[in-house]
Amino acid sequence: MDIQTLEIVRKANRLTNELGTNDPHKIARELGIEVIPLSFKKQRGAYKVLMRNRFIFIKDDLHPVMERIVMLHEIGHDALHREEAVKAGGFKEFNIFDMRQSRMEYEANIFASQISLPDDEILEYIENGLKVIDV
């Protein structure tokens, strides 16, 4: 694991440890990020800072599992890229599953995946004899 990825993992772990949860809606609420459901056509979510207020806009008809992933991804942008979001202005659409497209998307995905399934939880699964297919 490279230094940059390790720092993202540490930041995700610190956040969940400080807040005592990995629930994205609770995390957003604790961080003061307003979550607004929208009827996006294609885009699943977006993170935006407007006049120092932080927002996550989320597609209103996502499956709960996908909503969780997208929410954690957007929280990753808040934790890692808030300054870039302030400078960027409008919405920018990226495919969150194509990490080759953007460094920021890659980093937000690492952040989201660490909160979704932290290393210690993976180790617990392995120690209990579970396989990837079981998880």
Model feature map: region roles:
Residues 1-135:
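Active-site hotspot residues in diverse enzymes, especially metal/ion-binding acidic/histidine motifs
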